[in-house]
A protein has these predicted regions:
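Bacterial Sec-dependent N-terminal signal peptides
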Residues: 1-36
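A short glycine-rich, aromatic-capped structural motif
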Residues: 45-146, 160-168, 267
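Functional-site microenvironments in short loops/helix caps that host divalent-cation chemistry
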Residues: 24, 29-34, 55-56, 62, ...
Length: 349
């Protein structure tokens, strides 16, 4: 008899629970009976990985120069930093991807708020890649065919875009955000966080690929693999640009990715970061998701080294900078996006 009563009570409780849920007591539609139940209709299935990006798990690492760079270490000592999870493009932005950006702006100028008041020539004058960098950046270097063909010819579609300054990279991130979220909103999906340039700390953390001690993105300390092949696109020696297989830039996935699945975190082209330049930035910023923003500092951080740099600039801890308005044949960028959700590297089940 007791078992029957307990069974009947359980059935009654379950029936009442479903009835209350149907009435909206626990966030469903209908009345909430004056109870605090939250707002209904806010289902969230997790954040999808944007196309062309990889998710970088949260973690802690020691940010700073390698042991063989004692001069830089005296200015900005190594520091333990924690980085939250984020997404990052697995390759540098290519010529063809940047071309889509230019085409979309030209075809729909009125659709983007960030173009309001910029003037009719803003796209071509400020955003279109500066192809003259292939001639202007190098003394007495004239008649280079890349001036004519690098951005325009389909043979270079999968090569990293160059001749783009920090400001243009920022506008690209604004457009990419609007382009994605306009589509998602029109299809009843929640909007994604903004695309942006990675912070310098995020960039270095991602470049290390989860390794505790990594002189280069592949680990190190050597720049060749066991078969003698170069592991990145850079300048191996004076006047020697071709030992790595490419005299200039290389297609964005020509070399092995690091352990996070990121290509060309060393070499090919240097990459704009969000941060303003300060020689002692690592020492003075906070130790959790740091970004050094100084609106009065026109110099912006560039990381990774390029096809025209020696191996020192390929090291994960080596820092560099360019003026935010400068365009070069050796600087490009990739985008990042904040991950919304649990930041840990291992998700709870």
């Amino acid at each position: 008899m007791c078992k029957i009563l307990r069974y009947s009570s359980a059935v009654l409780s379950t029936t009442v629970l479903f009835a209350l849920q149907g009435c909206g007591l626990f966030g469903g539609k209908g009345e909430d009976f004056g109870q605090l139940v939250g707002v209904s209709g806010r289902e969230y299935d997790g954040m999808p990985t944007p196309y062309g990006m990889v998710r970088i798990p949260a973690g802690t690492f020691h940010m700073g120069q390698a042991d063989e760079d004692p001069v830089a270490t005296q200015v900005s000592f190594n520091k333990q930093i924690t980085i939250g999870a984020f997404f990052m493009d697995d390759t540098e932005i290519t010529n063809n991807e940047y071309r889509q950006f230019i085409y979309e702006l030209q075809e729909g100028e009125g659709e983007y708020d960030f173009l309001v008041g910029k003037g009719a020539n803003f796209i071509m004058d400020e955003l279109y890649p500066d192809t003259a960098v292939w001639q202007r950046n190098y003394t007495h270097h004239m008649g280079d065919p890349l001036v004519t063909y690098y951005y325009s010819h389909p043979a270079f579609d999968n090569y990293p875009v160059v001749g783009v300054d920090w400001e243009a990279a920022q506008v690209f991130c604004q457009w990419r955000t609007a382009y994605l979220n306009n589509y998602r909103e029109s299809n009843g999906m929640f909007i994604m966080p903004n695309f942006r340039l990675p912070s310098e700390a995020e960039w270095e953390y991602a470049a290390r690929g989860g390794r505790k001690i990594a002189k280069y993105p592949w680990g190190g300390p050597y720049i060749r693999n066991s078969k003698g092949c170069m592991l990145a696109n850079f300048k191996p020696g004076r006047g020697n640009y071709f030992d790595d297989g490419f005299a200039y830039t290389a297609p964005v996935n020509s070399y092995f990715a690091n352990d996070f699945g990121l290509y060309d975190m060393s070499g090919n082209v240097g990459e704009w970061c969000e941060d303003a330049w300060n020689p002692a930035a690592t020492a003075i910023v906070w130790d959790l998701n740091p970004t050094y923003n100084d609106p009065n500092e026109p110099q912006k951080v560039v990381r990774g080294g390029s096809w025209k740099d020696i191996s020192y600039f390929l090291q994960t801890g080596t820092r560099g900078y360019e003026h935010k308005d400068s365009t070069t044949a050796y600087t490009g960028f990739r985008c990042a996006m904040t991950y919304i959700g649990r930041s840990g590297g291992n998700e709870l089940n």
